[in-house]
Amino acid sequence: MKKLIALPVVAGLGLALLPAGPAAARPTAPAVPAMPAGVTAGSIAWKPCPDTDPVLGGLLKGLECGTLAVPLDYSRPHGKKIRLALTRARHTAPDNRYQGVVLLNRGGPGGYGRDLPTRFATGSNGLPTSVGSTYDWIGFDPRGVAGSEPKLACDPSYLYPGKARPDYVPRTAAQERVWLRKAQRYAADCGRRYGDVLKHINTKNVARDMDAIRRALGQPKINYFGYSYGTYLGSVYASMFPKRVRRMVLDSVVRPSGVWYEANLDQNAAFEKRADIFFAWVARWDSVYHLGRTARAVEANYYKGMAKVRKAPIDGKIGPAEYNDVFVPNAYRNYTWPDHAKVLADWVLRGDASGLRAQFGEPDWLAQNSYAIYTAVGCRDAAWPRNWKRWHADHSRQHRQGNTFLTWNNAWYNAPCAFWPVPGGTPQKIGGGKHGPNILLVQPENDAATPVGGAFEVHRLFPSSRLVLERGGNNHGASLSPNRNACLNGIVAGYLGTGVRPASRKGADAFCKATPAPDPTAPAATSAPVDPVLLPGLR
């Protein structure tokens, strides 16, 4: 039985001090067509990318760079324009084997994308060059992100004020009010800076931007590969532009009916399960880490380490919130486990904080930009509860139920949406008919960020899709990634190469065994480097 931290029943949070902002009313403006009349095809002037990009450094070397002007507001196609930053890795196969363009999205929302073509074109992610060479790979920074203009970044103190933040888990009403005021300030600052832009930052407009890219490239259809949030973007595009999809891979699939408040509640139980799997793995290797022979014993040591930094933050910078952040990636992927287990053992057993210092990084401008777009898109895509009592009740209940690892971290990560200066919109209706878009879904069974139910929901909504399930799979972003699952990679490569997909059957259409968990005693058994294609998005 887990030892749970009791949370107060908040009857007197003092919410009168915290006005909720605009009511979550449905927008009254007329619906905008998928691609309104009057939106003309723009043009892209490609040129070699600089060896050192002002935003992404050396990540774009060897690619072609370009920009595309698109409407800020698609209901006013001749109005204000914004600029999308793009990259391209051109096909190297003979023209008679050319298969068109593939647009790429790593997730988020808020993930940059201009670096992605290199790994797909060169095969460094496991895609055979015999397939990768037949496509033009297109990376793009979505509206507001990284190299696109305007680029958003709001109150930097919300993510990190230069010192340890308050504990994520509020033990008193006063502690909860501190986080609420921080969230309110963040939302207000975004409104002050970008009030005329925020209403146009949403997934439907990013899908329209993708179709504008297609038109500018002169392509009748696109291919697409999206991870995590990129699966929701792909689902939206396929629903808005079903005749424009040639092939589409969606890996680690978002549940569309949950966007976005319910989706985040879904995550809390899923992250708890994944944390338990990590703790059980550490216990299995007690001969290496000495943190306990059971998952519960390891978990107790994890919270013991958190109590130490709560009492005395490391360097005044790493408190319980930052400590939790350091270990959250273990719920996204297995290949961080050896390093993070050592970090935990060093801190709890020996008081050595060097590993925590190395793993903790103060958010840079890209992280601030990514978070600004995460909130801008999520808060605008759909309605969120504007009464904090609902948030408090839901997250307190989940915490009491034993979901202690991420629940309040997740609450505060999304809390600005309770105060966002523009109301949430109406989500795109997702789905296609029996003869709809040609989609391949890839889903790890134990994915925490996008729980497995989302893949089955999208599979039902697109009867023409095929679903490959990685049984026991734990790594968010399972194919063409550091997960290195040859079965999944083979199915995806076959699909991109020739269009072949598994035959349709009830439930999942094909299965792959999970990639084995790491063995810390194997030669050179250190954690694989974190590939930025799989940075935690979709929190």
Give the label of every model feature segment:
Residues 295-436, 481-482, 490, 507, ...:
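Alpha/beta-hydrolase fold active-site neighborhood
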Residues 86, 462-477:
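Catalytic histidine neighborhood in serine/cysteine hydrolases
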Residues 474-486:
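Catalytic histidine-centered segment of alpha/beta-hydrolase-like enzymes
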Residues 448-453:
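Conserved alpha/beta-hydrolase "acid-adjacent" motif
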Residues 219-229:
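Alpha/beta-hydrolase fold nucleophile elbow
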Residues 153-167, 238-297, 330, 342-354, ...:
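A catalytic-pocket lid/entrance helix-loop region that shapes and gates access to the active site
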Residues 2-7, 21-168, 173-175, 207, ...:
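Catalytic-loop region of hydrolases
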Residues 435, 440-443:
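Short beta-strand/loop motif that positions the catalytic acidic residue
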